[in-house]
């Protein structure tokens, strides 16, 4: 699949999926800290924050534009600005974010023109230089546009895009580095232009821009890679006319580490916008792996650092250089974190590299600030340098340029590196992306999901003072048992036979909360004790992040955790407490509604999460079990009753197994299992008898979901019984991050109260791409509405600007005995419903005509409908053009 066909129907939707990825999330400062180890006395994030503030102090306001000042719109300025913005978002440090934004925003005039670059109203325009080094500050402008929607920024972005549209090119389409460097492609230039162009293409729905980015990357690899060395040369001259260019190949004579760093950073950053599981993305990943292999191959074994001239080691005059070393660490760390590079292969080099940077390059300056030393100030090709020396690409030239401290070409990558190393060492990396085409991909998805195992150590809660009388508060005893188990390296925290009253339980890594047969954990729902029992934590509520009552069982950034056993979890909810907050009897607004409306408005407005505080005095009910930003999770065997709200709701988790449960709870909004922005999830052998959807796969609501921008993917549902609920398996409606790769098999769904078997619910306010959903061998008895429902007019319907997309859905060997309709599909102009396939199915007891509007291709193969009706393929809107 090409990028053009991939983005053909998703132009706006994909734009929105990441359009607010870097909005300021000041609430991150309020979150529990990740567990990255300290290196040289500080965590990687702390080193980045300290370096950022050191530079902010050193440079003051000199880099902000002002009349008569010396600040200029150029690439080092843009690199530093974007690094600060990224760090400000990741760390929640508002001062860093603000400084980074102002480095770009102060250049933008009221009319959207760019001071010192393009001010057409004053007849000042540098476009004729066609200098690709002038594009990088545009990345911060893209961020500001996503954050504010200010029309000035659209105009500024258009000026930058106009340059790229007119940029001179080589005969095969590669951007010239500058007008004064004709027919030349430099590794540096890939970072200067491509990340901006890729992000632009995604935000504004321009697949041709993304295709151009891939083309630039491929050309640079084709022309500059030396397979024997495993490295890319600094530059290539198509005409072989430059003094530095080899007359046969057009290549420069040496491998300069920083130029390789620019290229590698372009690869990992552009992959944020090019799907790594599509053909073009896979090719870019293959290039990244070659770059990474070269980085590892030429790492200095003594220090873990890298040399100015990459392959020349300790040749006289060569030196270990900080800007390239920082770039290389960033490339490896982000590549691992995003799943592009195998962790075990590259982690040792990355760790030694980062430790070497801190040990050998970071120095105190005597004023409480730190310096990044050993930075090559500048290097290029062609013309002469400030010393009158020819920039001929020779070894002697590269080692002759000045060595300084705190060059922004090193500071920026150092900030990026700290963010990614922090994430990596805190265990927040993603698994490798998986390309899914159909059921043939099922074994690969299943192989990624493995339940955690625990040491054979037991910690009985009764040993810590818990009493099985159903009246004495066991919360502290359970907390102590969990802490002891965790400190010992893991095991089981055992709840023995009897009833134990408790408040919120917070799990820690390597702890299995085991509820024995005959045991009940009764969660205290007495309103007067809710503030004490369920302290405010960072959570999601109906797809929007906030600070709210703790879920009954909660984990934050933990791994290898479980809730198991044959006992019972009783949430204690009733109309006298939790459920009463959303009791819709008598047609009156519920107490929950004002808080719900306020939270949703805060999410739309981008209010920092730490300011979205609910809990005591408010009426947003907690979910029952919510591991958050955790991995390797098992929930098995227990019976769950009387949940306040959603029952099982892992958020931003990876490798989750839900197995063998009996879920019987009929309160309002009692969804059974709602994986949200999760990867690699198995739900099997479970009974769902619920007051809302049995399973509802989610990925965040509206702008807040798009800000986080993480899809739910690689989800298997098998051997489950959906006895009661609104929908059997549902995608939505909090779905703005998207859903893909869902497999459903061998399930039974049968209840007059169960409205739909498979349901998609979305609208133009949520947006999101829902794709690759496969259902087979499912027996459906009676359902109230249809076997398949695709409702894109849910709630707000078409009244929004974020196109919902549903595509590549296959229903195979599915039977029903009493469904009014086979399908109910409600789309609208601009939305996409396409490639819906029924195969080898029998639907009996069908009473009403199918409802299909706003759909593309719907096909039937070997399908029987009784009473006898002829199935037919349906296209109510034309199929998308190729």
PLM features: residue spans?
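Extracellular "leader-to-stem" segments immediately downstream of a signal peptide or signal-anchor
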Residues: 28, 430-629, 634-637, 645, ...
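Extended ligand-binding groove/face enriched in aromatic
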Residues: 98, 108-245, 251-252, 382-384
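Extended ligand-binding clefts on enzyme/binding-domain cores
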Residues: 187-188, 194-311, 315-329, 341-393
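Short glycine/acidic-rich loop motifs that flank beta-strands on beta-rich extracellular proteins
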Residues: 490, 504-505, 524-526, 549, ...
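Right-handed parallel beta-helix
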Residues: 517-518, 559-567, 631-641, 654-665, ...
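Extracellular beta-rich repeat passengers
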Residues: 735, 753-882
């Amino acid at each position: 699949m090409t990028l053009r066909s991939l983005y053909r129907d998703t132009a706006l939707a994909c734009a929105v999926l990441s359009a607010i990825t870097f909005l300021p999330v000041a609430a991150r400062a309020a979150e529990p800290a990740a567990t990255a180890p300290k290196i040289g006395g500080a965590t990687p994030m702390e080193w980045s924050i300290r370096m950022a503030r050191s530079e902010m102090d050193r440079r003051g306001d000199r880099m902000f534009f002002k009349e008569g000042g010396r600040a200029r719109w150029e690439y080092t300025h843009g690199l530093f600005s974007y690094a600060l913005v990224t760090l400000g978002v990741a760390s929640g440090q508002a001062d860093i974010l603000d400084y980074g934004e102002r480095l770009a925003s102060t250049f933008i005039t009221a009319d959207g023109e760019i001071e010192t670059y393009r001010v057409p109203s004053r007849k000042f325009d540098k476009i004729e230089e066609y200098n690709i080094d002038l594009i990088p500050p545009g990345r911060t402008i893209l961020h500001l546009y996503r954050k504010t929607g200010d029309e000035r920024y659209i105009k500024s972005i258009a000026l930058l895009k106009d340059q790229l549209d007119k940029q001179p090119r080589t005969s095969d389409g590669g951007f010239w580095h500058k007008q004064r460097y004709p027919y030349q492609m430099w590794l540096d230039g890939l970072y200067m232009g491509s990340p901006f162009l890729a992000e632009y293409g995604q935000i504004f729905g321009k697949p041709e821009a993304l295709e151009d980015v891939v083309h630039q990357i491929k050309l640079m690899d084709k022309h500059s890679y030396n397979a024997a060395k495993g490295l890319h040369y600094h530059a290539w001259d198509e005409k072989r006319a430059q003094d530095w260019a080899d007359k046969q190949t057009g290549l420069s004579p040496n491998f300069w580490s920083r130029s390789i760093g620019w290229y590698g950073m372009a690869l990992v950053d552009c992959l944020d916008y090019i799907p790594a599981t599509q053909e073009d993305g896979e090719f870019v990943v293959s290039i990244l792996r070659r770059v990474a292999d070269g980085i590892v191959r030429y790492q200095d074994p003594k220090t873990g650092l890298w040399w100015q001239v990459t392959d020349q080691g300790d040749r006289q005059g060569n030196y270990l250089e900080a800007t390239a070393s920082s770039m290389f660490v960033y490339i490896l760390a982000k590549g691992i974190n995003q799943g592009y590079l195998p962790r075990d292969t590259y982690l040792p080099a990355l760790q030694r590299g980062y430790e070497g940077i801190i040990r050998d390059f970071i120095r105190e300056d005597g004023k409480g600030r730190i310096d990044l030393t050993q930075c090559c100030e500048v290097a290029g090709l062609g013309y002469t340098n400030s010393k009158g020396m020819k920039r001929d690409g020779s070894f002697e030239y590269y080692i002759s340029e000045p060595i300084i401290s705190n060059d922004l070409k090193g500071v920026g990558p150092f900030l990026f590196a700290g963010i990614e190393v922090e994430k990596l060492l805190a265990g927040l990396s993603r698994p490798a992306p998986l390309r899914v085409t159909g059921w043939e991909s099922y074994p690969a998805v299943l192989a990624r999901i493995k339940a955690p195992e625990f040491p054979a150590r037991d910690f009985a809660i009764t040993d810590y003072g818990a009493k099985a009388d159903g009246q004495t508060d066991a919360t502290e005893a359970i907390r102590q048992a969990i802490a002891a188990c965790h400190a010992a390296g893991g095991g089981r925290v055992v709840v023995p036979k009897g009833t134990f009253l408790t408040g919120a339980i917070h799990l820690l890594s390597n702890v299995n909360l085991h509820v024995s047969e005959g045991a009940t954990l009764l969660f205290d729902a007495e309103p007067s004790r809710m503030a004490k029992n369920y302290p405010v934590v960072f959570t999601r509520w109906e797809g929007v992040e906030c600070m709210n009552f703790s879920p009954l069982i909660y984990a934050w950034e933990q791994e290898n955790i479980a809730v198991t056993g044959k006992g019972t979890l009783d949430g204690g909810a009733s109309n006298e407490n939790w459920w009463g907050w959303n009791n819709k009897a008598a047609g009156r607004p519920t107490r929950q509604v004002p808080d719900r409306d306020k939270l949703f408005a805060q999410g739309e407005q981008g209010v920092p999460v730490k300011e979205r505080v609910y809990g005591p005095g408010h009426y947003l009910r907690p979910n029952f079990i919510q591991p958050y930003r955790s991995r390797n999770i098992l929930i098995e065997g227990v019976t769950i009753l009387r949940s306040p709200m959603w029952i099982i709701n892992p958020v931003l988790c990876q490798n989750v197994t839900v197995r063998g449960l009996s879920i019987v709870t009929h309160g309002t909004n009692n969804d059974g299992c709602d994986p949200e922005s999760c990867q690699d999830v198995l739900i099997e052998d479970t009974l769902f008898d619920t007051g809302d959807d049995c399973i509802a796969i989610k990925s965040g609501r509206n702008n807040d979901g798009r800000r986080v921008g993480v899809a739910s993917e690689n989800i298997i549902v098998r051997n489950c019984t959906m006895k009661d609920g609104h929908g059997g398996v549902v995608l939505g409606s909090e779905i703005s991050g998207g859903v893909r790769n869902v497999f459903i098999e061998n399930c039974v769904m049968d209840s007059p109260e169960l409205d739909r078997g498979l349901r998609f619910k979305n609208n133009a306010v949520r947006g999101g791409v829902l794709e690759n959903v496969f259902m087979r061998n499912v027996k459906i008895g009676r359902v109230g509405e249809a076997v398949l429902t695709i409702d894109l007019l849910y709630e707000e319907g078409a009244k929004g600007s974020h196109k919902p997309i549903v595509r590549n859905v296959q229903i195979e060997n599915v039977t029903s005995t009493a469904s009014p309709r086979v399908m109910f599909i409600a789309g609208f102009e601009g939305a996409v419903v396409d490639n819906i396939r029924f195969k080898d199915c029998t639907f009996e007891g069908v009473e009403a005509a199918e409802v299909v509007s706003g759909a593309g291709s719907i096909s039937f193969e070997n399908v029987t409908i009784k009473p006898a009706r002829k199935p037919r393929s349906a296209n109510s809107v034309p199929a998308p053009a190729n």
